[in-house]
Amino acid sequence: MKDYKGWKFKGKELSYIRDVLSTDFKAKSSGTMNERLEIKFAKMHNQRYAVTANSGTSTLHMALNAFGVGHGDEVIIPGLTVAMCGYAVWQCGAVPVYADVKKDTFLIDPEDIKKKITKKTKAIMVVHLYGLMCDMTEVMKIAKK
């Protein structure tokens, strides 16, 4: 087994780390370095804005809030997923509705999504697992109805 020789920084990484650690960072998603990342990322993707987050759970909250999911709404999520998907839905005041997954992929089953839709359905949350993608063509057809 090879001995661990420490981090191998090639550019300005150490300087950037020192800058962050020497500021009033306080573990929040703000600060000069964060703002620089958001601006550069937005430009790379030809967008006006980009928003960083500290976790996937935070991004789920942002997405649900951006789509106006709230009290009394239902969000269809896969029956096999991380708990945070359901937690994010609950925190918005909505109700997670679990759709079955396909036996061959363990991904959300578009046929079961159709069965779960009610007048209260506000969103469908897909989760891509194990290097596999959900059938987004079929899910989007359902979502657009």
Where would I find each of the regions flagged by the language model?
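Charged, low-complexity surface patches
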Residues: S30, P78, L132
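Alpha-helical elements of the RecA-like P-loop NTPase motor core of helicases
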Residues: S15, H61, G86-Y87, C134-T137
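Generic non-transmembrane alpha-helix signal with a bias for helix starts/N-cap capping motifs
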Residues: N34-E35, V82, M136
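Active-site phosphate-binding strand-loop segment of PLP-dependent enzymes
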Residues: D104-K145
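Conserved PLP-binding active-site segment in aminotransferase class I/II-type PLP enzymes
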Residues: M1-A66, G70, Q91-C92, V126, ...
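Substrate-binding/gating loop at the entrance of the active-site cleft, primarily
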Residues: H45-Q47, A53-F67, H71, I76-E111, ...
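Short, flexible helix/strand-to-coil boundary loops that buttress conserved ligand/catalytic motifs
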Residues: L21, D73, I117-T118
